[in-house]
């Protein structure tokens, strides 16, 4: 499960057209995923050309992260926190549960506008208008807590600091509050419920790790600055339509 849905998504979503950016994110994701219990999957991490701050996972190891996440992330560990979280949704089969609930709906149409704000066809917009996206766009609060806990452990196992997960979520929360709920991070809070409580849970997990161990974990890597420089040289991403 997941291959057919990924093909639908790839046919609809505009991807970032820079091989080095795509390769960097895919390598970082695989660094994390290959140390989980589902190292057997053919994990694929792709960057969607959307300024909306969001990411999503399909069964089988297909992870999509929006360009907006890369632009907001200040270091590799912040991006790794998002990838570790989405990876855990696959490990725990949360995405399988969503697809089973969908009962054969068109996934490529179903998640396109809700998660990226980018519609490549009138059909996709029509699906949004009739509410066809809800089953794909949201995991339960319990699913999100499990993905946070597993994602925290996933990045640590890969030798990456889990502080990035905490600082990235804090950054998005501050942006959301300052914008009055209408910023480009709004999709994250819509699709990832209970963020404030989850930030507190991540802080609790951080407090349980010795400071010396946290300080020994990686925050950046050799490719981060190059990836960000290439990202800055891209043309503007398609903007989400005004709500």
Model-derived regions: residue spans:
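A Zn2+-metalloprotease active-site environment signal
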Residues: 1-243
């Amino acid at each position: 499960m997941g291959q057919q849905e990924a093909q639908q998504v790839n046919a609809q979503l505009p991807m970032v057209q820079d091989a080095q950016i795509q390769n960097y994110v895919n390598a970082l994701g695989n660094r994390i995923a290959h140390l989980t219990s589902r190292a057997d999957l053919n994990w694929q991490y792709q960057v969607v050309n959307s300024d909306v701050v969001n990411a999503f996972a399909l069964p089988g190891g297909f992870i999509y992260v929006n360009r907006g996440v890369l632009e907001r992330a200040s270091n590799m560990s912040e991006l790794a926190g998002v990838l570790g979280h989405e990876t855990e949704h696959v490990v725990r089969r949360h995405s399988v549960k969503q697809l089973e609930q969908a009962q054969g709906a068109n996934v490529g149409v179903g998640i396109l506008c809700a998660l990226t704000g980018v519609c490549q066809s009138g059909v996709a917009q029509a699906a949004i208008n009739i509410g066809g996206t809800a089953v794909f766009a949201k995991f339960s609060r319990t699913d999100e807590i499990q993905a946070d806990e597993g994602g925290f452990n996933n990045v640590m196992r890969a030798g990456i600091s889990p502080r990035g997960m905490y600082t990235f979520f804090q950054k998005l929360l501050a942006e959301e509050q300052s914008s009055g709920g209408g910023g480009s991070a709004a999709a994250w809070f819509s699709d990832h419920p209970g963020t404030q409580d989850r930030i507190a849970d991540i802080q609790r997990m951080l407090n349980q790790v010795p400071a010396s161990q946290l300080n020994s974990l990686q925050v950046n890597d050799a490719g981060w600055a190059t990836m960000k420089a290439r990202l800055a040289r891209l043309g503007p991403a398609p903007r989400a339509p005004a709500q």
